[in-house]
Amino acid sequence: MKIKIGNILKNVVILVIFSLFISKINSEVVKPNPAKPDELVIAFMSPYFDPEYTQYSGAAEYALSKFNETFKTKYSKTIKLHTFTDTNDVIDSLDLVTMPVNGIVGPAYSGSSSTACLVFGAFAVPSISFYATGASLSNSGSYPYFQRVMPDDRLQVQAILSLLKKNGWTRVSCIHTNEDYGNGGADQLVQQSNAQGITVNTNQAIDPVDNGIAPEQLYYDIVFDNLEAAKSRVIVLYALFPPDCLEIWKQAKARGFLGEGFTWIVTDGCAELTGGTDPDLLGVLATFPSYGLGTEAYTDFERTIVNDYNNNTGDAFYKGASFSYDATYAMLMGIEAVLAKGGDPWDGEQVRTELRNLKFNGITGTIAFDKNTGDRLYGEFALLNLINSTKGSFDPIGKINPDSGEITLKSDILYSGPTYKVPSDYQVVVFDRTLNIVLGVITGVCVLIVIGIGSVIALQWRKFRYSSPLFCMFIIIGALMGLASVFTLLPTPTTPLCSGFPWLLGLGYVIVFGTLFTKTWRTWRLFSNARKFKIIRITNKFIITLVGGFVLLESIFMIIWTAVDRPIPLAEPIFKAGEAQLQCTSDSEAWWYVFVFYKVFYILFGVFLAFKTRNVVDSLNESKPITLALYNLTFVMVVAIALGFILRDNPIAIIVIQTIAILLGFTVTVSVLFLPKVWMILSGQQHSMDSIGTSMDSMGRSNGNTTEAESTRGYTNKDYNNQSVGRSFSAHATGFKDVAPSNHPQLGIVYTGGDNFPRVGSSQTAASRSEAEINVSKDVLAKANKKNEEEFGEFFLKPSEDNILKKKKKKKNNNK
């Protein structure tokens, strides 16, 4: 009920006067004598205007009926129950203690108890509250004669936090009614949440509904404006009565805070709800101290209360009646224990002592009191769920042990939506469809560019002969796989898409850069051995095997990752402002770190190869495009990772950065490697990319006029530009008297030492000679060239026509 300023001032004045009176008599309070020596009096104190009052008082009368015969026959005592309303806590409590009474069941709620029990304690009258949960009542110095059968706010908050931790929620908002119960519960929630690493991002108070009159709209607007600013998704509602909750939910529906994505958890104040018939309330959760549901004793008790005692609520049963019964039953057991020991039932200290020694099974479970504070021990909470809007009340679906945090469910939890999927405690960001379409179109353009380059390579295969067109196509295929990974990022994440993204991106990366660097490694190895006049055999089959090894290693890692900790879509909190993005997540982030950082090996290896092949002849030299590709890849990784941390609060920026990083990483790499060559072919500037032959001189050279350093280094661009060396030479050319050529049956003529190769004039080339002079079948020569090219790729040195002619002449002379 709404607290009036006048009542507050009046109560303060009365308490001050009463405190002065208590201090003067030095705690020696003389209680009035009972009206009848053989009569015992139990007082029941609860707000008369509550709809639950008739059931609460009826439950107390029912408990009393269990003891009437025992007290009469065994102790010659009669016991009476006087009911009082707590319209004015101080005045009503003073009236009670001056009746006098042996004990008091009540007051019902924390606000009344916090005042009335001060008076009860001063007059040494034991009391048992059946619905007060305020944590301040546990202060034994202020409330020495206070007991309660309802678990306190501390335990209820522990039960709520157990539910939060079970669902992985770390952010919660709180709304509470502005009175003792709501204020105390909210304070406990904030204190215990902070201690357990759960953030209460906003704590909002609203006055309770007073006789059907709700607070002004302005105050509700303030509450929900703050909830919106905090991007609240999980909301704990500490409200005094169901009408308070219904009014707040009415406002929440108008502001869009009901439905899928929002979780409401109410406490015992609203767990008595009977009017939750709005379908939008489906999925609301409640915690309520266990009240015996499911036991035979509870079933009989509920039937009795509804049918036999004052009940103006139809067939509805209020859970608090179970606690009213247990509180009354405990008070009578304490008084009986005093009588059984020959004690004085009017001695409040004796009654309190026996109460705190009790342990029995009540309707709500095991009843026992803390010997120092009088708090209920063995408290257990029922987890309630609103799953039937026609019924309009909560149904129990499980139990929560607040001490251990254990939650036992007998059915799945229905969340708002309704859905059985656990919602996020963050505002889940849904990316703009228009943005996704734009990113998809850009990715599609990049895919077409790569496909176009690949088509030119396939159609102009021989013109890319010295670039190993087979491996060029491997690079194209890998780039397409990497670009395809973008299309797994744009739709709403699903488990197959989450698993497909690292597979496509990882294999695409390995194929592109594994092929590029392996092919370049072959160039380096061949030319580094050429300066030593060594012939090494590195076939295409060997290169394919190396690339396959890289792919196999990547596949093994991905298989283990997928089997052990497969990425799944979760709404992960990645933004400081209370937002989250539905993203693919594994239990351990170590998988992603390994996935990203071990690929740095490829970058380092690429830098090494680019440096080593910087002086190779132009037709085989890819150091410059590799350097550009590496620079681009390094830049993209560094900038993308840095921006990813800086812009974590911007969900749109995150997806854009991821997409652009992938597009630049693959599209630019393919472009710098192949686009210049493709352009030269398409524009007609160059008819063949292999017009400049690979001569035998590329294996190394030496003559008497060179220095030792020159004779041991590989063949360079400078050497190539200073000499025009054809594909073949004549053994009779001038200056070749010391040449010792080796006629390899597959490699052709290989220079193994001697003077420099001569500058072969145009008149000496094979193109200028007549077919009669060469006298070699072109078909035979073409077949030989094709066979060796397939095995040795661009490093095959064709058998020279001069050599073939020379061998034929030599054979003829030998025959003669």
UniProtKB/Swiss-Prot annotation:
Null allele phenotype: Cells grow faster, reach higher densities, exhibit delayed aggregates formation upon starvation and altered chemotaxis toward cAMP. Cells do not produce SDF-2 in response to GABA.
InterPro entries on file: ANF_lig-bd_rcpt, GPCR3_GABA-B, GPCR_3, GPCR_3_C, Peripla_BP_I
Subcellular location, record wording: Membrane
PROSITE patterns according to UniProt: G_PROTEIN_RECEP_F3_4
A GO-annotated cellular component: plasma membrane
Region listing for Disordered, in residue ranges: 697-718
Signal sequence bounds: 1-27
Protein keywords: Chemotaxis, G-protein coupled receptor, Glycoprotein, Membrane, Receptor, Signal, Transducer, Transmembrane, Transmembrane helix
Domain of life: Eukaryota
TM ranges: 437-457, 470-490, 497-517, 542-562, 591-611, 626-646, 654-674
Topology class, membrane: Multi-pass membrane protein
Single GO MF descriptor: glutamate binding
Cytoplasmic compartment spans: 458-469, 518-541, 612-625, 675-816
Its biological purpose: May be involved in early development in cAMP sensing and subsequent chemotactic response. Probable receptor of GABA and glutamate, leading respectively to the induction or inhibition of SDF-2 formation.
Protein name per UniProt: Metabotropic glutamate receptor-like protein E
Species the sequence originates in: Dictyostelium discoideum
